Amino acid sequence: MIILFTEKKPNENSIIVSSKSNINIDIYIDSFLSIIMASQSIKNIMKYKRKNSESIIFDISLLDKQFVNAFINRITQGLYTFDKYITKKIKSLKIYIYAPQISSQVKEDLVTICQNAKHTRDMVNEPSNKSTPATFANNVTNLFKKNKKVSIKILKFKEIKKQGLGLVDAIGNSSINPARFVVIDYHPNNSKKCICLIGKGVTIDTGGYSIKSTASMNNMHMDKTGASICVGLLKALSNTNYKNRIIVLCPLVENVISNNSIKPNDIVKAYNGQTVEIVNVDAEGRLILADALAYACKNYNPDYIFDFATLTGWSERIHCHTSFTYFTLNDKLSNDITNIGNEYAERSIRIPPWTDYLQLLKSNVADVKNSDFACKNSDGLMSSIFLMNFIPIQYRKNWVHFDIRLNSYNNNVNIADGFASFYNMILKI
């Protein structure tokens, strides 16, 4: 699928999208929900068009400006397909958009978002036999090898142990495909701020000895969504010559069962020196993120920290149309996330910033535990609190934890993955 903007007014064969209902139109848009419904119906249109044409034109010149970014973002997200391993390819369709009401810069930004969101989803959808921690790390190196502002360091398993990344070590030790800890440093001249992006990179999650059910294990090769989003965001931002320094940290592991696997109630020393009781091996994402967060704070003194993870599925359970939930102590960042999300039709819900729940992390046999907290049915909140425990107090104000969805495949509600929101949030800094 290729997205192009056209400056030439389309003919009568175009699909007319409008916010005015008193004219002859194909799609009427007046709200967030109408955009969701439109993106679903457009899927069916595309199936027909692929059989009869090589392109499709959307005339959105009559669409209110407030809906333009949202409409374009959602239809491109909804039409995404991953067909790399299908031998009989579906004909690629060119999508032309006529939108004279927006500037060339806005169009350029939308193309950047759409292209890099697609590349991110392609990374997410790679199966675990094609994307091990090592191959993911190597692919990242190849992606940035021509960018002179980017340097990459890949910690292999022995170096992970040597650095004291005990929680990454504990999970990564379970597999014949050992862990990697990827550090990507985008460092433009005269940068004034440092932003750390941290992504959960579990290339396959069986749950380990806290093994998942058959149904729950499906699509767990996508548990590297957080790491993929971080890489995709840096690719997009570096191509715009973004002004601030960006550090991307990707702890990459397989969570599988073996003779070396971590077991329930084992105790492990984290990077920050705290001991952690591993009550639930299937709560591995928060473990590797905890080490990465502590590593970021100690080594880079960041002005902002954003972590991304398919951690608990809270966003999916709370509402079918939420792209992600998030935890932050910063009201301004929260307002920015909400406002940008409204502009791009990526809805989110803020997890309550109740820091007093830190005391519920206490273990009887270690400093903290990673699961089985006294506050039941609150995993989205408690996993956020667990992560905050590994961030020194002075860094907590400008930290946001994004609990995102497994949404890089074609789902029934065409949910967006939040890429546009994350990209524009960082651009504002």
Describe the residue ranges of each PLM region.
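Short amphipathic alpha-helical segment within the helicase RecA-like ATPase core
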Residues: 1-201
